[in-house]
Amino acid sequence: MAKTNSYKKVIAGTMTAAMVAGIVSPVAAAGKSFPDVPAGHWAEGSINYLVDKGAITGKPDGTYGPTESIDRASAAVIFTKILNLPVDENAQPSFKDAKNIWSSKYIAAVEKAGVVKGDGKENFYPEGKIDRASFASMLVSAYNLKDKVNGELVTTFEDLLDHWGEEKANILINLGISVGTGGKWEPNKSVSRAEAAQFIALTDKKYGKKDNAQAYVTDVKVSEPTKLTLTGTGLDKLSADDVTLEGDKAVAIEASTDGTSAVVTLGGKVAPNKDLTVKVKNQSFVTKFVYEVKKLAVEKLTFDDDRAGQAIAFKLNDEKGNADVEYLNLANHDVKFVANNLDGSPANIFEGGEATSTTGKLAVGIKQGDYKVEVQVTKRGGLTVSNTGIITVKNLDTPASAIKNVVFALDADNDGVVNYGSKLSGKDFALNSQNLVVGEKASLNKLVATIAGEDKVVDPGSISIKSSNHGIISVVNNYITAEAAGEATLTIKVGDVTKDVKFKVTTDSRKLVSVKANPDKLQVVQNKTLPVTFVTTDQYGDPFGANTAAIKEVLPKTGVVAEGGLDVVTTDSGSIGTKTIGVTGNDVGEGTVHFQNGNGATLGSLYVNVTEGNVAFKNFELVSKVGQYGQSPDTKLDLNVSTTVEYQLSKYTSDRVYSDPENLEGYEVESKNLAVADAKIVGNKVVVTGKTPGKVDIHLTKNGATAGKATVEIVQETIAIKSVNFKPVQTENFVEKKINIGTVLELEKSNLDDIVKGINLTKETQHKVRVVKSGAEQGKLYLDRNGDAVFNAGDVKLGDVTVSQTSDSALPNFKADLYDTLTTKYTDKGTLVFKVLKDKDVITSEIGSQAVHVNVLNNPNL
């Protein structure tokens, strides 16, 4: 049986070493030389590096196979050796398909080290190939590369957008380990042995541990904000842990082949124009970095049209990471961004709807299209360096936290179109099951996801669908086709969130098997008509459009339904399988209507009880309780849920059978307290609209006589904060780190007051929780009932957010400003405490808190 690609989904199970040059048996090749790796081959140096490390020995025939794909078993061997993992000769991995094979002990070693995982079904696929995205994921994990990233990650390759490996690939790009291929990154392409050797060697040289006994440094210079250049001997023996810099730490080191020079990558940017002490083992050096901008390039990026937190990116000089505007300001440089449409007219794409900016931050809600953006960097009192680039604005994936509801619809018209987010048309119908018949086609009719804390129908352009088996169900532009009998899982993705839907494809054509009536027991007054909704379904539970010939109505001999008085047809466009039909009471009595197919098999039934048409009672009742004679009309109306409630004057027979609503022409309705609520007659209904909390009597009269009465209690029940979900935080060790409310609480930015996520309330509400952004009431949390993003009359105060520093803190630049709390400096050490309180003036009203510890590395008290 052919292998599936299920192991490719196990990103975390595809290890880094698997991408390195392959070993298909533990037979050694002679020396470094491989006949199929000629001198000058682009990966020769990396292959030789791994040979020197004892990580690879080649294939049994003495070749290397640089163009062949690497398998996972061979990778386990290489990974074990490159990391010097302990190997138990008798060890067996937990994977059932990797036991008692030549590489078992190596697979066991990397599994024990936490480097690899299987597919979740006890499989490892030792002979399986590895794609570039899976490689990137494990390379990042094995060498802890995420902690070594400098600056924000930016997606520069369009084929990475929405891909599961987007972040991991961007980390490799950020660190200079990968540069893509021909304008693409090709995340799904299998990695060759030569490519694997190149990636592993580059990474190990920069981030692998080394013996530093023979290293000696003669000079240290800051070559760029995040780089040190060391000169000396034996520098190839140094590791990043051997280098320290005040206020920062080294995260990687890359030495020249002869060990006479090395480039050190720092975790942050050095302070400009300041004497800095650098220590390499037991040696100490003082250096200063004077920043000079010589070259500038605007990154050609694609941005989302309505996403907050986006900014123009540009690179300076030959630095790999993106430039930092705040850092440039510290280095006595001013930055200006100028945006124009392609015709040269100003483009108001920056925050505040401006065409120029000093931060490069984009507005939310930008018109889609291409724009020209010029970045100007000017040294104060000196020259200006500038560059213009093109950026693209599109509707990219929607940031979602959960996929709540997925509805597929069958394209029964076979026209290649299924309405999305709206009523279906023609013969198309929504699927209740996950069953398809061979040859059927379907697509999404609706997908609801939680976006910014609110359940919304997702834009179809933000959705991607992949099939686990294209031979069973194929997918083209999210349009699925049942190709053959079997099972396949559709993985639906919105942003970084996925949901799996398992479909079964059969060869059993759809047929009508059920007719259900709602209600299935009908009490109706003679000569009156009441609605009955009929639902017709097939053997899978999906809607079935039944025409006149499909259903035979067998009427009871009691005559409760007249001959020809009922014809169940459910083929109306847009509502296949469902039809509401008026059933008229004929003769007084009772009986059951049976529904049969052409073969006489019973599909369902409807019991009908027809009573005499005398109106004995009239009952003033809630529309929501029509037909429930004797129920009290008194009710409670919560203004936080709805502002209106409806009544009608219902007619009942002497048997308490509901007939129909009374015509209210000639009737009058009165609210006895207009300050609390008013009441109006609208058609055959009385509509009561609440204004303010209190009780009010509603009287319905005709010619002065009371026809109905109800008491409505208007309430506005208290909503309070039940708990708070704070963001996880880490100790801040570096300078120039900004700490504010956004450090501990997830915010959805707004030009006015921001929405605060993670505030759990005592009752559900459709209104947003916001925080006052500025002014005397900064930090006030409130329920924005009118949705205007400003606290005013009618909104509900929920509590306050505050920030303070502990008494033992040494944070001289601390401000009790939630949006500008602290920018860390070289001697900062202490703790900031963010609290959510019911009342900021009552310290015992705390609901929750989150502490942020600050401990900058060069603090003299450490």
UniProtKB/Swiss-Prot annotation:
Q: Report the Pfam families cross-referenced here.
A: SLH
Keyword Signal in the entry? The reply is yes
According to the UniProt entry, where is the signal peptide?
1-29
Principal location: secreted
Any idea where the SLH domain is? 30-93, 94-151, 152-214
Molecular function as annotated in GO: structural molecule activity
InterPro entries in UniProt:
Cell_Envelope_Struct_Comp (IPR051465), SLH_dom (IPR001119)
Q: Name one GO biological process term.
A: external encapsulating structure organization
- UniProt keywords, alphabetically: Cell wall, Repeat, S-layer, Secreted, Signal
> What is this protein's function?
The S-layer is a paracrystalline mono-layered assembly of proteins which coat the surface of bacteria.
Q: What is this protein called?
A: S-layer protein EA1
Record organism:
Bacillus anthracis
Q: Which gene encodes it?
A: eag
